[in-house]
């Protein structure tokens, strides 16, 4: 299997898993808010991935990490596993699912745009068309065809979802500069999300245990939708 085919397969796996986000976000926030749901999901992701990394013997590499490595990992963890999901879960709880879904998936367009500046990639005709069509699709949905005005039910929440999508795009571009073992750095990303969501949960919400109905969405989200999907994504 060539590298390009393997990369395409990994992307397809991620897309299939991330398609479950609206489902787990809805059922996982029956009584929990976005801070609480993110905390429990991050806890599951961190526990599962760290156990896997430890059993494989790869976790020992963190001993050789420099301060710069830890700082960069913390930044990426905040961008891609905390801010992105914090705003995304808020969106699915308080805004129209279709609007959230469309704005959420602006990150592939933003990845192309950011790569031009941060990775010095060339702007080809294909990339130009992709960016233009992508933004046209987003504008069409948000304006409902009336391009003179934006018609969304909760503009602030949708704007936050858009900010989260930008953070995930930035995370995706910057993560290409990380040369560490994927399962190790991903487990550390979710450690950052776990700590950050714990602080924000206590600051803006409150500690709460998930209900019995919320356990399975949290497990599914923590193990697959968030957890292992990131290993495929950053490869």
Which residues does each PLM region occupy?
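Specific transmembrane alpha-helical segments of multi-pass solute transporters/efflux pumps
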Residues: 17, 21-22, 50, 57-99, ...
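Glycine-/small-residue-enriched transmembrane alpha-helix faces in small-molecule transporters
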Residues: 1-39, 43, 149-177, 192-196, ...
